[in-house]
């Protein structure tokens, strides 16, 4: 063994200090400092663990391009690590780069074709590429490998429902609810399917169950209000949006929907007030809302449901 030089000893010591300072800073949510520590550490020694910490910190700081470059560097350094490719797939998903997401998943599957997450992420890439048939096949493979894979059942149910396969989607939802009767996402999808297949009372039961489990579930209020509106029950629709706004006074979509109902009931002033509030809370939706607002007069003649 050749004795370490003074420089090597110093480098080793500095590397350890930087790495663990970075880990501490990351745990405390001090991301810019954590990133600086990890960057300096990998400049001394680009070992995989520290590169992985750096990639995670970049991701947390929403520096996705940097995270991707770091993960590519890890894949070049050690092309046998499945998790590197799965992390890369996750970053590509966040960037809506579904082609490269699919490639990363394929590389992960070559290394290990028994990893349910690889099939699940391949399905998400397929959905992004509007290839629902492949998505169903990949989700089915994920479920075969992991029988209680709730995310895969949920996603498969959503895709099946999008393809108007209500019966198959309902079977996946039943499986989800057998695994967890309080699964909010599954209950909402069950309610959506029941609403669309002329079972409004059972649908409302699903939405009410979700709201009793979680009074902050925004989607449940919207779906419940839409169903009341579809059945011309304006007062109940108003009540549900009143409740939503009482629980969350910053719920822009609820003001928007309540504004629609008020207009249908002939309360133009109340409607305008709610619309203004919706725009104030979510200015990014302003163009959409004002465009829709111009059509409201026509909508009152023919509610499009």
Q: Could you tell me what each predicted segment is?
A:
Residues 15, 48-49, 82-83, 116-117, ...:
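Helix-start (N-cap) detector for alpha-helical repeat units in TPR-like alpha-solenoids
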Residues 13-43, 47, 56, 60, ...:
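Alpha-helical segment of the N-proximal tetratricopeptide repeat
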Residues 43-44, 77, 111, 145, ...:
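Structural marker of alpha-solenoid helical repeat scaffolds
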Residues 26, 59, 93, 120, ...:
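Position-specific recognition of the canonical hydrophobic site in helix A of tetratricopeptide repeat
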Residues 28-36, 61-73, 95-107, 128-141, ...:
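Structural signature of tandem alpha-helical TPR/SEL1-like repeats
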Residues 270-305:
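Terminal, low-structured helical/coil segments at or just beyond the last alpha-helical repeat
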Residues 2-17:
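TPR-adjacent "capping" and linker segments in tetratricopeptide-repeat scaffold/adaptor proteins
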Residues 20, 53, 87, 121, ...:
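Canonical tetratricopeptide repeat
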């Amino acid at each position: 063994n050749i004795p370490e030089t003074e420089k090597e000893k110093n480098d080793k010591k500095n590397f350890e200090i930087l790495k663990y300072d970075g880990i501490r800073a990351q745990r405390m949510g001090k991301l810019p400092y954590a990133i600086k520590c990890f960057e300096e550490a990998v400049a001394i020694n680009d070992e995989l663990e520290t590169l992985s910490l750096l990639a995670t910190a970049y991701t947390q700081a929403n520096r996705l391009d940097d995270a991707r470059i770091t993960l590519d560097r890890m894949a070049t350094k050690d092309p046998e690590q499945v998790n590197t490719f799965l992390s890369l797939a996750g970053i590509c998903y966040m960037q809506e780069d579904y082609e490269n997401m699919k490639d990363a998943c394929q590389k992960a599957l070559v290394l290990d074709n028994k990893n349910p997450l690889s099939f699940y992420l391949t399905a998400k890439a397929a959905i992004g590429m509007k290839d629902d048939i492949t998505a169903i096949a990949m989700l089915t493979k994920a479920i075969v490998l992991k029988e209680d894979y709730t995310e895969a059942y949920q996603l498969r149910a959503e895709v099946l429902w999008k393809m108007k396969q209500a019966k198959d989607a309902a079977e996946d939802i039943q499986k989800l609810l057998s695994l967890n009767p309080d699964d909010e996402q599954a209950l909402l999808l069950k309610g959506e399917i029941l609403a669309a297949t002329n079972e409004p009372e059972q649908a409302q039961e699903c939405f009410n169950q979700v709201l009793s489990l979680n009074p902050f579930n925004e989607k449940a209020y919207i779906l419940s209000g839409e169903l009341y509106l579809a059945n011309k029950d304006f007062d109940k629709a108003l009540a549900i949006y009143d409740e939503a706004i009482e629980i969350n006074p910053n719920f822009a979509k609820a003001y928007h929907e309540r504004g629609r109902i008020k207009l249908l009931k002939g309360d133009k002033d109340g409607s305008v007030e709610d619309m203004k509030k919706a725009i104030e809370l979510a200015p990014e939706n302003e163009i959409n809302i004002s465009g829709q607002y111009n059509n409201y007069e026509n909508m009152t003649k023919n509610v499009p449901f």
